């Protein structure tokens, strides 16, 4: 009887020891089988196409939480190391810079970084470009001739353009454009331009609304990204048939190409799977979706081709802007001073 008791106690103790050692491994295994969580500020349809392709190719499941650049970037900063997110995807790079400055990103795997063209990834390697879009001046073909178009984004500060053009100043897209202006021309020139914009521009709630304003003739032109036009043309064209695109080129601030970014959170419990996701998005599978899909954003992978309807990246003559230098906080402060926010 005593032997039985000893055996039972020994067995329980042995089980307890094994359980104690097995628990961390069990937790890791559970974390590896759970879906990775992506905080997504990119267009939901594009990210869903990436998620579908990634899960099909790897078997790794993904949960997506959608929001805006500013909303999710600030949420990550507030959550800090307690964030449940594994990956952050944005439309524009200032939100990536915000999270990076808070020290919340893990280094991106080198074999992912080397898939992406130089200039579409920051030098610190803590996030990487996943797509890009270019600034354009969408104009009403019935109200402006090519000879009447502004030669530079800066020309729109001229009183001659008063109430003739528009933009969506509250959106992350325009704030990224203003951030590029700040990086290229400096604070004084940017502040002056934004104050002139307050006097001259018609403010819209969103880039689609601004393009509709151009198409209807409410305004003659608007500063937007190119994919709004191409997306509408691919559908019905009802919001863009009277519209054409003017590319500023010549390294002008109005030729700014904005980088959409992706990064893995340092606090991720599924870091390996998160890194695999980022590698897939920047690799052939993810970049081919940009070429064949209906997002009309530019591919940034080395050797990757963009949608053939787009003006090639090499022909845009974009200014050289380090995506990690775009200062969203300073731009928002300048826009508030100008009365735009």
Positions of PLM-derived features:
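Short, low-complexity disordered leader/linker segments with a strong preference
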Residues: 1-35
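Conserved N-terminal structural module of periplasmic/extracytoplasmic solute-binding proteins
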Residues: 23-87
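Extracytoplasmic ligand-binding site segments that recognize negatively charged/polar headgroups
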Residues: 41-48, 67-71, 77, 84-219, ...
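Short amphipathic alpha-helical coupling segments at ligand-binding clamshell hinges
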Residues: 50, 189-193, 260, 269-281, ...
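A ligand-binding cleft/hinge motif common to bilobed small-molecule-binding domains
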Residues: 94-98, 221-242
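A bilobed periplasmic-binding-protein/Venus flytrap-type ligand-binding module shared by bacterial periplasmic
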Residues: 136-143, 182, 257-270, 289
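Periplasmic-binding protein-like
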Residues: 161-168, 280-304
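An extracytoplasmic/periplasmic, membrane-proximal ligand-sensing/linker region
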Residues: 188, 295-341
């Amino acid at each position: 009887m005593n032997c039985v008791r000893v055996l039972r106690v020994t067995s329980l103790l042995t089980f307890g020891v094994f359980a104690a050692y097995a628990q961390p491994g069990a937790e890791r295994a559970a974390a590896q089988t759970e879906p990775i969580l992506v905080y997504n500020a990119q267009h939901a349809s594009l990210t869903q196409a990436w998620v579908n392709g990634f899960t099909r190719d790897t078997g790794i499941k993904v949960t997506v939480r959608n929001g805006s650049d500013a909303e999710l970037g600030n949420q990550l900063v507030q959550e800090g190391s307690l964030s449940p997110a594994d990956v952050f995807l944005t439309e524009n790079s200032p939100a990536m810079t915000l999270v990076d400055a808070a020290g919340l990103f893990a280094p991106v795997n080198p074999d992912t970084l080397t898939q992406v063209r130089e200039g579409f990834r920051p030098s610190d390697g803590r996030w990487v470009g996943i797509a890009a879009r270019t600034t354009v001046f969408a104009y009403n073909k019935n109200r402006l001739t090519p000879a009447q178009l502004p030669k530079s984004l800066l020309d729109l500060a001229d009183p001659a353009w008063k109430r003739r053009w528009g933009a969506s100043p509250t959106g992350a897209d325009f704030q990224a454009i203003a951030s590029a202006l700040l990086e290229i021309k400096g604070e004084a020139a940017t502040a002056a331009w934004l104050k002139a914009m307050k006097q001259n521009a018609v403010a819209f709630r969103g880039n689609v609304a601004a393009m509709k304003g151009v198409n209807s003739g409410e305004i003659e032109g608007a500063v937007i990204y190119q994919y709004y036009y191409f997306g509408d043309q691919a559908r019905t064209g009802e919001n863009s048939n009277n519209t054409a695109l003017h590319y500023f080129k010549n390294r002008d601030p109005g030729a700014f190409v904005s980088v959409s970014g992706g990064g893995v959170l340092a606090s991720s419990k599924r870091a390996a799977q998160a890194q695999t996701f980022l590698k897939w998005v920047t690799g052939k599978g993810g970049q081919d979706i940009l070429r064949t899909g209906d997002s009309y954003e530019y591919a940034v992978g080395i050797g990757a081709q963009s949608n053939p309807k787009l003006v090639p990246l090499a022909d845009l003559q974009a200014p050289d802007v380090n995506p990690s230098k775009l200062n969203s906080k300073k731009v928002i402060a300048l826009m508030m001073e100008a009365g735009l926010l």
